Amino acid sequence: MKLNFKQRNILLGTILMWPMMGIFLASLTNLLENDFFPEITGFGRFALFAFAGLLLSAIISFLIPVFSPMTRAQNEIMDELEQNGQTQRFIELTEQEINRLITTGKAYKHYQFFSQYVSLQADAFLIQHNPQAAIQSINRINLQDLQTYTGKVLADQQILGYFDVQMAIAEELCNADMANAVMRDASPYLQKVNEKNLGHFIIANEVYFCYYMATGNYAKAYEHARKYFDHTANRFCSFLGNSCSVKVFIKTGQFTEAERFLQNAEQQTTSTPNQRQILAYLRESLNRARAGM
């Protein structure tokens, strides 16, 4: 059985707290100088505190969402994303949490989550063919705040994701001026990307792809679509390579090729809700292009 986001969070929290809670209970017993089970010694005593620590950890992990609005919102948002994709309800959930963080003055304190929700929401608007709403959403974060308030471990990926959404908006609008402006800001970060870091490569390559699509250089865009096929061991990269190729051939009016790559993408999908939405978006785009011939 596959665990959802909330269940994985509870399990992870339980595992991480387990040793600490076991030690805490053993120390508390010694501090109180009250041995509740004096007849249990040796390994049995160790097992007792281990079990008690596990039970306490599980209870605490289960109760955290009850008392933490941020954790509760994160569970709802990520569960919706994993189970149904970037739906209208997903947009509403992210909007609620974004507004809560702003009104409570905690947006900068939890900027990693705030900026993630904004980027995901903007991307969801693009799936709905609503670039203007995506612009309004992504404009709630900026590069300087990402550099200042995002933790160092995730800062690079968050910044790349920010540029990725901006460039995707430029592509949707076919706005070369916007694409050039985004590229000027993004270039220093893109140049630092090491292709061995697959996560960063996937995002950076998509930024380049969207840039060339927005500026009408479809040959260069196709080169970047093909780069994903250098990582065919990763099924998601194959999916991206085919998906990006579909976009290129729609723009160039080569609908037979677009159909071929779309079918390849359908074969490469892992059937996540998000990938199904991307495929539906591409199918709709191809049908529109054919109807407009």
Give the positions of each predicted feature.
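N-terminal alpha-helical membrane-insertion module
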Residues: M1-I91
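"A position-specific structural signal for the A-helix of alpha-solenoid helical repeats
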Residues: T71-D79, F113-D123, Q158-A168, H200-Y211, ...
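Membrane-protein extramembrane domains
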Residues: T87-E95, N99, Q121, I250, ...
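Flexible helix-coil transition and linker loops at the boundaries of alpha-helical arrays
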Residues: I98-Y111, L143-Q157, L173-N175, Y189-L198, ...
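Alpha-helical adaptor scaffolds
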Residues: D164-N234
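Long, non-transmembrane cytosolic or organellar matrix-exposed soluble domains/tails
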Residues: N205, M213-M293
